[in-house]
């Protein structure tokens, strides 16, 4: 008994463990957990309320109800500890053992565990190699199964119906064994010899030819291997004894009124016990077979319901028709154990209240109501009251506090002095949603919040609430102060830009004071310094907006780092000069000598942070805010209805538009345009008109005519209140002003299509009834969308966090030479993102050389590029830089600091232990709610711009062709005959300024390397038709042109010219099925010509709907158009935009009709078509051919004889990321994902750093597929964690054996989360049952590496400050010293390169980074 007691005392200490293993419980193990068998279904006695003996709450089995007191009351108190009462059988011990002691039920007949039966793929089915349907028939007593065939012709595991069984019995008497129910399955499982079965399967897999059989065999081998390795036995999947949960985990609570509230589990257990007992009695009475069978089936069903109610058949419901919550339901879903209790816990010492603005707070402060503070800091106050001798006991102190005596407030002031509190606003979408502040006691009941942190919290003061938490321990206070203080979170982790940026009224005030106006009082005065100017302003000698000259003194730092004063007389305004007074030393006056719009203020704060560091910036931000508020108050900006100026030209513009619409209507009625064209054109006209009126309106509102000092009338930016607000970025946008004063424009129907009648009125004029009705359409859709968007965006964030949660910075340098090559992002000729923005804060992977000089590196390998370096690169005209990336990082777990680069929120190299995965997930998920949900239809307002049909240069320079194939036309122009060709404009230094894609068939007006002037047109093409260009000169010969079958002759009514259109396949009838209309180019004698450089004849296959304007036998020259394909058809694809698009990319979903990419490089030719498919052949350099069958409705965008490279698009569509990975490799895949995701966010004006997307891509590429197992233990086609294969291969190579070969696999984020090594993390994410079943069979061990697993087991997370704790635990258990540990963790880089960084934040190597 003593040992038993010690056992429990040991259990009270928290166990120290490094990993958690899950497995199947054997009957012996279940019995060893049990403290007695539960024999009766009774719970408690309704009169005495004491638990029944041997019942579900029995005290003898589960322990006493009161501490150290047996049930009958014979033994009480500590002195009898450990005694078992002979009367009631209760052990005298703590009552809390009722939370940990289990019971058991001995089942009269074995029962299959539903998880291993029904959780697909069925483990029992796989193990026995039987279908689930068959096993269910056996288990639920519908069929017999042969367990031992003996010498009979029957097979083992053969199913027999009742008739077949009786017949077999007659024929073979007792020579064979067959039975039904779980006993039969148990027998079959028990007979399996895993080792010999394994050997048999391994032999079979070598000889098998069928693909499906191979898959099944592989699955079985993996399962049997799992059983062998984990030491589980197959028959343990059948339960012979059922464990019973401790009673305090399924409590029975008395309610007032004599009723009881009970856990559903008790009902489920009662059913099992009742049926089990009845079955025992029936077996004792040897009842008829059919009754016993029925009872056994009912027992099986009740155990199924207990384990997972509703998994099979109808769910068992309670009294109120609600399905009962089974054991499986307890752990899964949002309300389950994992997500409700382990990952989300309630916190003590917290409060919540409404927030109000605190404009006089400093950035690190928040106002805390006195009442709230007193409650939160109670324990500290009690302690201090006692220490001061104001109260002798805690009780006394409590009384003092309750009475709110005067001294209590003094002590509260002392207690909260420099004790940070943590504020949080739900939803916490990124780490800026929780920040620490120093409390300031205030009257009232609302929390005061500093206005500058509102952006980070996404808070406003329209009734938002926030929660306050108190960090108690010293470490917690330290972390709150050092890491979470609002002053330490100035930059956003998503893009490294300041998040502490003034908004709204502050911006308005700063903008107002920095505006310059003509002819104001005091214009032209000169001041000796700002204080003189301030005197003049205070005495109303000059006005705030007057243009004056002032002597400004600045501090400049020279090359040697010495600080010198420099004075100069500057043209400025009174307001800007006043603003310069709050400018910290070291910031140039130029930064404020401009209109202070929101963008400029952000730039100012950013420069301050980079140039002066954190402390100065925080002080400066506060000063900016105070100044902004002061001048906003003085400005007294207000709006009235007359501020909405309606442009005079509006009437005229509307008249013109209505006239154009009428003309199109007439054209439509006379049949010149189709309904679709008419609709598109009308929508186009109104979009254009809206733009014109809006422009006129902005000109009217934005400028005013004034008289300057010379008496001339000049235009100046107006001080119209509406315009000021929009222009400064304080509130509103030109779009909204357009609705107020120009016209509302086109409205959208709920399905995303556009209503073609626009709302011509604006809000000032007021809407007509019809217009109002039309506008409710779109408005209501907007509201509905927002509601749906929030849920979708939250789910995306959850998946992202789950896939990256275990990714931290684990070492300084992994020593890889790999990386990604960064180039500027160019769209439609404009550089959307210059190179400097893309490489800022990254580490260079290989030396960057000066363009045109290969000996002199500008930047050496392993340099962290900060602002200064990036400026140098830009000066030198570097066009591409290879930088380290998380995708190519070779750290076994996590990433290394150099591959990650700069910590965007701190501005220096990332610290060890930073949880970069979660930060990436938050940065991508947080703006999710700003993305749209809708799918754009082509030709909506989304793309209402007119089609582009030429390239006009924006800057002068020289032209460079890239990847461009072209032929020279007789008239001297060039015609493009390639698809991936690009044309760039370089400046005098050879830097690329613009880049454009050239479509096939474009006419190019310049030669390579020619000089061009700004505005010159380089190339033009027909945007509505795709031409087919002849590459040889000769004569046209039509092949398979049959009038009325393959071609339709059309004559234009207006011009009288005839053209031939190739008929659609569906219209051709039977005789035209095998005809392939094509145009062949022949010489004078009629011999075929070949395309230069190939042996293919010059012939062009004509797709349906293409139009030929030439006659048979007509001459063609090089570069002439043989035929054209109208482009309307292919462009009706919807563009999935916004959130769904981002989700599709991260889930790596294949698009509906994916683009078909060339499987290899070679020359295109077309083979014989099959039914409904076209045959495309690629012949590579060594003459081998690759065939591709393509459905007829797909648009092939390559022609006969064209040369394609591997991975190039040959059939139009959205490329599938899997294809890009397979054909082009990891780097192009990364580039594709980053580009596509960034496009969506860029459209919404959201900036996210590329590296966050790369971090997620890294997690999507964690697995590899084995293509050749070599001598490894992996199976072909198996998906394995990359690191495991690398480790295994290293061992094999060391033993001189064949390593496994593998290909990378791209998994979507949901799949990747579920395929993680940690089963705890996967189970708490989704599909809990499936994950746990799989893990139990495998006997998986969870090494608790990620953040989630550690939160669940209640430990510090292995990131940030918790990483030190973890590494110490790990190494102290191995017995390493501190210095040995340091070398292991890798403080120095493995490749011996030093990180250089010219900024003052340089980190010397060998120093501890971070905390």
From Swiss-Prot:
Q: Which reaction does it catalyse?
A: RNA(n) + a ribonucleoside 5'-triphosphate = RNA(n+1) + diphosphate
Q: Which Pfam families match?
A: RNA_pol_Rpb1_1, RNA_pol_Rpb1_2, RNA_pol_Rpb1_3, RNA_pol_Rpb1_4, RNA_pol_Rpb1_5
Question: What protein am I looking at?
Answer: DNA-directed RNA polymerase subunit beta'
Q: Which InterPro entries match?
A: DNA-dir_RpoC_beta_prime, DNA-dir_RpoC_beta_prime_bact, RNA_pol_asu, RNA_pol_N, RNA_pol_Rpb1_1, RNA_pol_Rpb1_3, RNA_pol_Rpb1_3_sf, RNA_pol_Rpb1_4
Write the record's keywords in alphabetical order, separated by commas: DNA-directed RNA polymerase, Magnesium, Metal-binding, Nucleotidyltransferase, Transcription, Transferase, Zinc
Where does the chain bind Mg(2+)? Answer: 460, 462, 464
**PANTHER family given for it?**
DNA-DIRECTED RNA POLYMERASE, DNA-DIRECTED RNA POLYMERASE SUBUNIT BETA
């Amino acid at each position: 008994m003593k040992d038993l007691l010690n056992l429990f005392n040991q259990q009270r200490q928290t166990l120290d463990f490094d990993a958690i293993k899950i497995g199947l419980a054997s009957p012996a193990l279940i019995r060893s957990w049990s403290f007695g068998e539960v024999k009766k279904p009774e719970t408690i006695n309704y009169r005495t309320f004491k638990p029944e003996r041997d019942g579900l709450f029995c005290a003898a089995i589960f322990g006493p109800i009161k501490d150290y007191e047996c049930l009958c009351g014979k033994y009480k108190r500590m002195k009898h500890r450990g005694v078992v009462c002979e009367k009631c059988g209760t052990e005298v011990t703590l009552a809390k053992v009722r939370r940990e002691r289990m019971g058991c039920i001995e089942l009269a007949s074995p029962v299959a565990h539903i998880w291993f039966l029904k959780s697909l793929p069925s483990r029992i089915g796989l193990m026995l190699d039987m279908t689930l349907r068959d096993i269910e028939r056996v288990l639920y007593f519908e069929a017999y199964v042969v367990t031992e065939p003996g010498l009979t012709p029957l097979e083992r595991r053969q199913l027999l119906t009742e008739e077949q069984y009786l017949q077999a019995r007659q024929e073979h008497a007792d020579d064979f064994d067959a039975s039904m129910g779980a006993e039969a399955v148990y027998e079959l499982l028990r007979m399996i010899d895993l080792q010999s079965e394994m050997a048999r399967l391994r032999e079979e897999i070598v000889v098998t030819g069928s693909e499906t059989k191979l898959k099944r065999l592989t699955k079985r081998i993996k399962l049997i291997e799992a059983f062998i390795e984990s030491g589980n036995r197959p028959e343990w999947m059948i339960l012979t004894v059922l464990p019973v949960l401790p009673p305090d985990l399924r409590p029975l609570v008395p309610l007032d009124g004599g009723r009881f509230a009970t856990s559903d589990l008790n009902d489920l257990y009662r059913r099992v016990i009742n049926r089990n007992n009845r079955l025992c009695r029936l077996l004792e009475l040897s009842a008829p077979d059919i009754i016993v069978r029925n009872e056994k089936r009912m027992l099986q069903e009740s155990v199924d319901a207990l384990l997972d109610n509703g998994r099979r058949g109808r769910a068992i419901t309670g009294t109120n028709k609600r399905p009962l919550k089974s054991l499986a339901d307890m752990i899964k879903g949002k309300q389950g154990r994992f997500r409700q209790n382990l990952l989300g816990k309630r916190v003590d010492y917290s409060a919540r209240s409404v927030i109000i603005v605190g404009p006089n707070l400093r950035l690190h402060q928040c106002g805390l109501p006195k009442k709230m503070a007193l409650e939160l800091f109670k324990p500290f106050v009690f302690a201090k009251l006692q220490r001061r001798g104001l109260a002798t006991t805690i009780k006394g102190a409590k009384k003092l506090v309750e009475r709110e005596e005067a001294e209590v407030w003094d002590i509260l002031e002392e207690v909260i002095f420099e004790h940070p509190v943590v504020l949080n606003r739900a939803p916490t979408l990124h780490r800026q949603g929780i920040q620490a502040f120093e409390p300031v006691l205030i009257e009232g009941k609302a929390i005061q919040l500093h206005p500058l942190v509102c952006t980070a919290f996404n808070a406003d003061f329209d009734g938002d609430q926030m929660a306050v938490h108190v960090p108690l321990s010293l470490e917690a206070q330290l972390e709150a102060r050092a890491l979470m203080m609002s002053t330490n979170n100035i930059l956003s982790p998503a893009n490294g830009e300041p998040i502490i940026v003034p908004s709204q009224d502050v911006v308005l005030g700063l903008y107002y004071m920095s505006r310059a106006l003509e002819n104001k009082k005091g214009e032209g005065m000169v001041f000796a310094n700002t204080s003189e100017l301030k005197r003049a302003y205070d005495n109303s000698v000059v006005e705030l907006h007057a243009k004056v000259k002032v002597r400004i003194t600045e501090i400049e730092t020279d090359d040697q780092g010495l600080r010198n004063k420099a004075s100069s007389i500057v043209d400025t305004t009174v307001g800007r000069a006043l603003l310069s007074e709050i400018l910290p030393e070291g910031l140039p006056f130029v930064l404020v000598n401009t209109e202070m719009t929101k963008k400029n203020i952000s730039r100012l704060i950013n420069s301050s942070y980079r140039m002066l560091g954190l402390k100065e910036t925080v002080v400066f931000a506060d000063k900016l805010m105070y100044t902004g508020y002061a001048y906003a108050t003085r400005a007294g900006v207000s709006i009235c209805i007359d501020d909405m100026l309606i442009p005079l030209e509006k009437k005229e513009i509307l008249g013109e538009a209505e006239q154009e619409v009428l003309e199109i209507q007439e054209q439509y009625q006379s049949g010149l345009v189709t309904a679709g064209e008419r609709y598109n054109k009308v929508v186009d006209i109104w979009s254009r008109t809206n733009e014109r009126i809006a422009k006129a309106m902005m000109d009217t509102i934005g400028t005013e005519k004034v008289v300057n000092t010379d008496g001339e009338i000049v235009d100046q930016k107006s001080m119209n209140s509406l315009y000021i607000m929009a222009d400064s970025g304080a509130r509103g946008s030109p779009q909204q002003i357009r609705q107020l004063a120009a016209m509302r424009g086109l409205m959208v129907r709920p399905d995303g299509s556009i209503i073609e009648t626009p709302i011509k009125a604006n809000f000032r004029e007021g809407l007509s009834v019809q217009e109002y009705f039309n506008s409710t359409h779109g408005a209501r859709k907007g509201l509905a969308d927002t509601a749906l968007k929030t849920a979708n965006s939250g789910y995306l964030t959850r998946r992202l966090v789950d896939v990256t949660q275990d990714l931290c910075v684990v070492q300084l340098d992994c020593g890889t030479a790999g990386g990604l090559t960064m180039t500027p992002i160019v769209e439609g000729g404009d550089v959307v993102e210059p190179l400097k923005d893309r490489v800022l804060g990254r580490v260079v992977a290989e030396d960057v050389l000066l363009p045109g000089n290969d000996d002199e590196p500008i930047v050496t390998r392993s340099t962290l590029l900060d602002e200064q370096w990036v400026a140098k690169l830009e000066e030198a005209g570097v066009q591409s830089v290879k930088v380290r990336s998380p995708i190519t990082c070779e750290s076994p777990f996590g990433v290394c600091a150099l591959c990650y680069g700069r910590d965007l929120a701190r501005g220096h190299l990332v610290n060890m232990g930073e949880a970069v995965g979660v930060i990436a997930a938050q940065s991508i998920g947080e703006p999710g709610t700003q993305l749209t949900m809708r799918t754009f239809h082509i030709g909506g307002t989304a793309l209402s711009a007119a089609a582009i049909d030429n390239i006009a240069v924006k800057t002068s320079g020289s032209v460079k062709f890239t990847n461009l194939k072209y032929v020279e036309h007789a008239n001297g122009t060039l015609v493009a005959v390639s698809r991936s060709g690009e044309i760039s404009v370089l400046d005098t230094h050879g830097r690329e300024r613009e880049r454009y894609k050239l479509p096939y068939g474009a006419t190019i007006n310049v030669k390579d390397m020619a000089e061009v002037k700004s505005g010159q047109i380089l190339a033009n093409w027909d945007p509505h038709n795709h031409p087919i260009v002849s590459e040889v000169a000769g004569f046209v010969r039509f092949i398979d042109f049959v009038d009325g079958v393959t071609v339709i002759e059309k004559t234009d009514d207006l011009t009288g010219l005839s053209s031939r259109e190739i008929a659609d396949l569906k219209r051709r009838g039977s005789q035209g099925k095998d005809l392939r209309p094509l145009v062949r180019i022949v010489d004078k004698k009629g011999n075929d010509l070949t395309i230069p450089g190939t042996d293919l004849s010059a012939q062009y296959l004509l797709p349906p709907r293409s139009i030929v304007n030439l006659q048979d036998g007509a001459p063609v020259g090089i570069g002439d158009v043989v035929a054209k394909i109208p482009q309307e058809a292919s462009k009706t694809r919807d563009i999935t935009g916004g959130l769904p698009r981002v989700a599709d990319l991260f889930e790596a979903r294949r698009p509906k009709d994916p683009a078909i990419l060339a499987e290899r490089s070679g020359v295109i030719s077309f083979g014989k078509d099959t039914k409904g498919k076209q045959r495309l052949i690629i012949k590579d350099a060594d003459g081998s051919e690759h065939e591709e069958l393509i459905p007829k409705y797909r648009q092939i965008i390559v022609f006969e004889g064209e040369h394609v490279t591997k991975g190039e698009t040959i059939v139009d569509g959205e490329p599938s990321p899997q294809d890009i990975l397979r054909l082009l490799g990891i780097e192009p895949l990364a580039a594709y994902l980053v580009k596509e995701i960034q496009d969506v966010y860029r459209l919404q004006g959201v900036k996210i750093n590329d590296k966050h997307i790369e971090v997620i891509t890294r997690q999507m590429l964690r697995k590899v597929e084995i293509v050749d197992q070599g001598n490894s233990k992996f199976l072909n086609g198996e998906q394995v964690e990359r690191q495991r294969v690398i480790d295994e291969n290293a061992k094999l190579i060391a033993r001189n054996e064949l390593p496994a070969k593998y290909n990378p696999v791209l998994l979507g984020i949901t799949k990747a989360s579920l395929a993680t090594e940690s089963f705890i993390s996967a189970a708490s994410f989704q599909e809990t049952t499936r994950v746990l079943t799989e893990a139990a069979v495998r006997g998986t061990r969870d090494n608790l590496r990620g953040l989630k697993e550690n939160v669940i087991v209640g430990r510090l997370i292995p990131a940030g400050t918790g990483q030190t704790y973890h590494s110490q635990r790990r190494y102290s258990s191995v017995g390493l010293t501190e210095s040995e540990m340091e070398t292991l963790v890798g403080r120095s880089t493995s490749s011996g390169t030093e990180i250089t960084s010219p900024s003052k934040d340089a980190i010397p190597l060998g120093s501890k980074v971070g905390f």
